[in-house]
Amino acid sequence: MALKKYKPTSPAQRGLVLVDRSALYKGKPVKDLTEGLTKSGGRNNHGRITVRFRGGGHKRSYRTVDFKRRRYDVPATVERLEYDPNRTAFIALVKYEDGELAYILAPQRLQPGDVVISGSRVDVKPGNAMPLANIPVGTIVHNVEMKPGKGGQIARSAGTYVQLVGRDQGYALLRLSSGEQRMVPATCMASIGAVSNPDHSNITIAKAGRNRWLGKRPHVRGVVMNPVDHPHGGGEGRTSGGRHPVTPWGKPTKGKKTRANKATDKYIVRSRHQKKKG
């Protein structure tokens, strides 16, 4: 889908670039596949802010998307492509031969009327899903599982994809968009193709209100706060903060490594940070 560039008919329109969604379905989602969604406003069960700068935004209903794709060897026809406010990618409504409906992540080049299928050995075409063990090496995939049966976790955002670069001793070697190379069990499912809406990265928000519609509140820098509010706060006139960047609670940020899961380090063949060292 193309980008829409708006003429500066008002200050808010100036610079506005959005994705053209005219080809998507304009009605409401399937009621049986939707759930209510309560806003948290960044608060936890105690009512305390655990994620700052969130709140407000347009009301949403949650679309139940099938990330597992475990209905083997049952063809499904793509009824329509839909917008989903809960993710950057588009979703596709598919209808199985027995009449059951489901939402799946829409890959690029998937059109209404196409037939998708998941199974142990199926055609390598966008929207089909099968275990990594049977996908040809070099194939572009998305919605990749990390544990068999858990459902896809890798490459689900708009325009993302993973390349299968090899297989070894029951594991598949994947190259992620970040540059990381990692192993996952070859019995994990993956869907063929790259995720839809690749132009999402080219959107220009153009006004503060549009971010508020998305539930994002203003992100205040620590350096403009008072000393009581942030370690970078205070000072006469504009200051640089005077120390290495820290969070409001004094922990190093901007480049500080936060990965703590040592148990899965052995599956990471190449770190995403290696490319930066050059």
From Swiss-Prot:
It holds the Pfam family Ribosomal_L2_C. Transmembrane segments: none annotated. Residues 225-278 are annotated as: Disordered. One of its GO terms (biological process) is cytoplasmic translation. Gene3D superfamilies: 2.30.30.30, Nucleic acid-binding proteins, Ribosomal protein L2, domain 3. Residues 269-278 have a biased composition (Basic residues). GO terms for cellular component: large ribosomal subunit. InterPro entries: NA-bd_OB-fold, Rib_uL2_dom2, Ribosomal_uL2, Ribosomal_uL2_bac/org-type, Ribosomal_uL2_C, Ribosomal_uL2_CS, Ribosomal_uL2_dom3, Ribosomal_uL2_RNA-bd_dom. GO terms for molecular function: rRNA binding; structural constituent of ribosome; transferase activity. Keywords: Ribonucleoprotein, Ribosomal protein, RNA-binding, rRNA-binding. Part of the 50S ribosomal subunit. Forms a bridge to the 30S subunit in the 70S ribosome. One of the primary rRNA binding proteins. Required for association of the 30S and 50S subunits to form the 70S ribosome, for tRNA binding and peptide bond formation. It has been suggested to have peptidyltransferase activity; this is somewhat controversial. Makes several contacts with the 16S rRNA in the 70S ribosome. PANTHER family: LARGE RIBOSOMAL SUBUNIT PROTEIN UL2M, RIBOSOMAL PROTEIN L2. Belongs to the universal ribosomal protein uL2 family. This is Large ribosomal subunit protein uL2. It comes from Parvibaculum lavamentivorans (strain DS-1 / DSM 13023 / NCIMB 13966). The gene is rplB.
